[in-house]
Amino acid sequence: MKNLRLTVLAGGTGSAKFIRGLAKIFPQKNLSVIVNVGDNIKIYGLIICPDLDTIMYMFSNMLNKEKGWGVKEDTFNFQKMLKKYGLETWFKLGDKDLATHIYRTFLLQKGYSLTEATKILSKSLSVKAKILPATNQWIETKIVTKTGKIHFQEFWVKKQAKPKVLNVTYEGIKKAKPT
């Protein structure tokens, strides 16, 4: 098994648990993970990639395993300050996690692709596995409800998946090319 290479398609917190199990059998350097980007969202001008980050934090032993997302032992001073400014804070971004989003956004603004930015972030966190976004193009999963179309994260996190789903759309999918 030490020489066997494995590629996994991943998305969401369940994938991190599955891959954590695989990482006990296979060396990290033998694992490639192609990760969902349809849940990515822009918040406060930052590019947030929840599924990529969950996998990256899992491999770097930084993942908050209780929640299944975010960085363990993270603080939320950034969120508290935003709340004082009167901004919505339904999408929880920890202070350490925030550094990831700031750095990723900086790299993307400098012209790096999402694949390149993910490689740089992963290397900085000593991740040996190859983590690849499914595409470098921007895709958004939108949920259509009675009140209109909302981003998947707003549906899942802010509204706790309560509205009745009438349809699901994937904006940008037709222009997306595999990584």
What is each PLM-predicted segment?
Residues M1, T179:
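Glycine-rich phosphate/diphosphate-binding loops that line cofactor/substrate pockets in enzymes
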Residues K2-L6:
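Extreme N-terminal starter segment of soluble prokaryotic enzymes
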Residues T13-G14, I34:
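Short glycine-rich anion-binding loops that position phosphate/pyrophosphate groups of nucleotides
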Residues K17-N30:
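A short, Lys/Arg-enriched amphipathic alpha-helix followed by its capping loop at the start of a domain
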Residues N36-P178:
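Electropositive, gly/pro-rich neighborhoods at or near active sites that engage anionic ligands
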